[in-house]
């Protein structure tokens, strides 16, 4: 198998602090670039954990269609601005940020007070504009998660009349593109290719770390396949026939035969099916007359037992 390497050939940071990394992976055997590209892209776009704003509480507001006196943006605009925040929380539990501001003021992401475990990537992101003589109080909930989580209208949090839920996008990777160069990558090499990947993140993680995390997830996914365990199927025991479940009392045996069998711990037809004719004769006080009586009773219900232990 070819030993390939991955090189980051470009890295850019945009004004909104989003990051773009371009990687070149190769040399690869023909077909491997598509396998790697599709697998990495799927994990990068939907499998990485990230942070997102999941709810906002605005003082004096109890629904998203309201307006706030002295604030240029309406509630829906403020919720959208909060949803678009690039944020990174190292706390697996809920984090709550707070803002108390007075106008005139343009509120930006950096004005929200979080604990030291929360980093706001783009601190210049505008949130709201407050006019002179007016105030704005916000409470912003931040959680960690994977993928996309819609608002659950039946959750306990949504029953709070003043807590405005937001459908959360936890995905730290915004875009992944890849192309395949099918030309030879070394002199004399044929049938080889290279994979070129462009990874764009929201800035809460770097493209390098995103690639590494995606690769580790794929390793964990495929590692168990390296050791295939043979599982021996345990045959199912056949269910006993209805006749075998008939209790001894229903065979209408003589009192002597019945009592001898009960003392031998024979309680049903199923127990009798483990005996041969010779076995019956070995039961204490059980003679050939009683044994013949049992044989006849079993034959009446369509069951026969062997004459001897060695009979087939």
Curated annotation (Swiss-Prot):
A Gene Ontology biological process term: DNA-templated transcription
Q: Which SMART domains match?
A: RPOLD
Q: What are the record keywords, sorted?
A: DNA-directed RNA polymerase, Nucleotidyltransferase, Transcription, Transferase
What EC number(s) does its UniProt record assign? 2.7.7.6
Q: Where is this region: Alpha N-terminal domain (alpha-NTD)?
A: 1-229
Which InterPro entries has this protein been placed in? DNA-dir_RNA_pol_insert, DNA-dir_RNA_pol_RpoA/D/Rpb3, DNA-dir_RpoA, RBP11-like, RNAP_asu_C, RNApol_insert_sf
Q: Where is this region: Alpha C-terminal domain (alpha-CTD)?
A: 240-312
Q: Which GO terms describe its cellular component?
A: cytoplasm; DNA-directed RNA polymerase complex
> What Gene Ontology molecular-function terms does this entry list?
DNA binding; DNA-directed RNA polymerase activity; protein dimerization activity
State its role. Answer: DNA-dependent RNA polymerase catalyzes the transcription of DNA into RNA using the four ribonucleoside triphosphates as substrates.
Task: Give the multimer and partner information.
Answer: In cyanobacteria the RNAP catalytic core is composed of 2 alpha, 1 beta, 1 beta', 1 gamma and 1 omega subunit. When a sigma factor is associated with the core the holoenzyme is formed, which can initiate transcription.
Family of the protein in this entry:
Belongs to the RNA polymerase alpha chain family.
Q: What does the entry's domain section say? A: The N-terminal domain is essential for RNAP assembly and basal transcription, whereas the C-terminal domain is involved in interaction with transcriptional regulators and with upstream promoter elements.
Q: What name is this protein filed under?
A: DNA-directed RNA polymerase subunit alpha
Q: Origin organism of this chain?
A: Prochlorococcus marinus (strain AS9601)
Gene name, per UniProt, is rpoA
């Amino acid at each position: 198998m070819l030993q390939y390497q991955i090189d980051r050939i470009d890295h850019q940071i945009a004004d909104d602090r989003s990051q773009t990394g371009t990687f070149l992976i190769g040399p690869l055997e023909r077909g491997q670039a598509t396998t790697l590209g599709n697998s990495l892209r799927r994990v990068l776009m939907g499998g990485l954990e990230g942070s997102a704003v999941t709810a906002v509480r605005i003082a004096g507001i109890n629904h998203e269609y309201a307006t706030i006196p002295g604030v240029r943006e309406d509630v829906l605009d403020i919720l959208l601005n909060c949803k678009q925040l690039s944020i990174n929380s190292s706390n697996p539990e809920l984090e709550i940020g707070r803002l108390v501001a007075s106008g005139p003021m343009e509120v930006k992401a950096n004005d929200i007070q979080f604990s030291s475990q929360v980093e706001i990537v783009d601190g210049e992101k505008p949130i709201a504009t407050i006019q002179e003589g007016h105030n704005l109080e916000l409470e912003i909930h931040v959680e960690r998660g994977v993928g996309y989580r819609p608002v659950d209208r039946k959750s306990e949090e949504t029953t709070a009349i003043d807590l405005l839920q937001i459908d959360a996008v936890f995905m730290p990777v915004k875009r992944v593109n890849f192309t395949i160069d099918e030309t030879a990558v070394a002199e004399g090499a044929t049938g080889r290719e290279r994979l070129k990947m462009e990874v764009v993140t929201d800035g809460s993680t770097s493209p390098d770390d995103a690639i590494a995390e995606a690769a580790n997830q794929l390793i964990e996914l495929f590692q168990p396949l390296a050791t295939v365990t043979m599982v021996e199927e345990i045959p199912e025991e056949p269910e006993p026939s209805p006749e075998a479940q008939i209790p001894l009392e229903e065979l209408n045996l003589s009192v002597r035969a019945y009592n001898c069998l009960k003392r031998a711990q024979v309680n049903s037809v199923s127990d009798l099916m483990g005996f041969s004719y010779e076995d019956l004769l070995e039961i204490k006080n059980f003679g050939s007359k009683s044994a013949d009586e049992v044989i006849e009773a079993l034959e009446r219900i369509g069951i026969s037992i062997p004459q001897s232990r060695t009979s087939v």
